[in-house]
Amino acid sequence: MSGADRSPNAGAAPDSAPGQAAVASAYQRFEPRAYLRNNYAPPRGDLCNPNGVGPWKLRCLAQTFATGEVSGRTLIDIGSGPTVYQLLSACSHFEDITMTDFLEVNRQELGRWLQEEPGAFNWSMYSQHACLIEGKGECWQDKERQLRARVKRVLPIDVHQPQPLGAGSPAPLPADALVSAFCLEAVSPDLASFQRALDHITTLLRPGGHLLLIGALEESWYLAGEARLTVVPVSEEEVREALVRSGYKVRDLRTYIMPAHLQTGVDDVKGVFFAWAQKVGL
């Protein structure tokens, strides 16, 4: 998908619904704990190395929120998966946060952490690192308390539907900001579906609102236990073009090249992108 004059549907089958159905079926085998072990425990979850992917993602988020430009009352996290790190810097800027995921098992995993249930995944190292990066002297326990208090709901979502949250959603709409990490490319069978999914979630955002998007670069598959999930490979330029087509001004776009020691055989990801984009309009 290159060239500003190309249709969002260029290069794709006329109907992506069969591909989307296959993706949805494959995700029924998704194992949240296996995914967390693969990506948020060492080596990828080792936050001691400042050049690691975990510190890089946390820095991108913290630095963007530190500008003071991404703020408001309501934020929606699109396709949260079983993770919360993507909201650690956001929670001091938004008092009403909605987390979402297509899979009930991921929503249950989030619920365990939010309710501080025994056996919930331990995000304390991420919380500590976020506090360190932000440099405000906040203790990680307070950071986690604030995040738990400000997540008001965990809802189902389907980014392939024109109304991703369904009709009559309890989430306040439109939101002041959206965050989404490793969702759109992981659930889209082709670039046209990726573009449409981005269009769909953009309807949840107010004009002038901000989107912080994190995703995989040039990845075609990843493992989550017994599940081997397909991913639409995207490049930095394809991400930029998709954002512009969906009506955004790209404020920042950064890339991280995955080093060899973090290529652990659980996927074929080449890198990670971070995009800060603002929805055009008043």
From Swiss-Prot:
Gene Ontology, cellular component aspect: cytosol
Q: What's the effect of swapping residue 35 to F?
A: Strongly increases KM for phenylethanolamine and S-adenosyl-L-methionine
Q: What is the effect of changing residue 98 to A?
A: Significant decrease in protein expression and enzyme activity with octopamine as substrate
Q: What is the effect of changing residue 112 to C?
A: No significant effect on protein expression and enzyme activity with octopamine as substrate
| Stated regulation of activity | Inhibited by methyl methanethiosulfonate, phenylglyoxal, tetranitromethane and diethyl pyrocarbonate. Inhibited by 4-oxo-1,4-dihydro-quinoline-3,7-dicarboxylic acid, 4-(benzo[d][1,3]dioxol-5-ylamino)-4-oxobutanoic acid and 1,4-diaminonaphthalene-2,6-disulfonic acid.
Q: What is the effect of changing residue 219 to A?
A: Reduced enzyme activity towards phenylethanolamine. Decreases affinity for phenylethanolamine 6-fold. Decreases affinity for S-adenosyl-L-methionine 2-fold
Q: Which terms are listed as keywords in the entry?
A: Catecholamine biosynthesis, Methyltransferase, Phosphoprotein, S-adenosyl-L-methionine, Transferase
Give the first-level EC class, as a single word: transferase
Q: Which residues are listed for octopamine binding in this entry?
A: 219, 267
Give the pathway listed in the UniProt entry for this protein.
Catecholamine biosynthesis; (R)-adrenaline biosynthesis; (R)-adrenaline from (R)-noradrenaline: step 1/1
Q: Which residues form the signal peptide?
A: none
Q: What GO molecular function terms would the record report?
A: phenylethanolamine N-methyltransferase activity
**CDD domains found in the cross-reference section:** AdoMet_MTases
Q: Which residues carry this modification: Phosphoserine?
A: 7
| Impact after mutating residue 185 to A/Q | Strongly reduced enzyme activity towards phenylethanolamine. Increases affinity for S-adenosyl-L-methionine
Family under the similarity heading:
Belongs to the class I-like SAM-binding methyltransferase superfamily. NNMT/PNMT/TEMT family.
User: What NCBIfam families does this protein's entry cite?
Assistant: GntF_guanitoxin
Protein name per the record:
Phenylethanolamine N-methyltransferase
Q: Which organism is it from?
A: Homo sapiens (Human)
Which gene specifies this protein's sequence?
PNMT
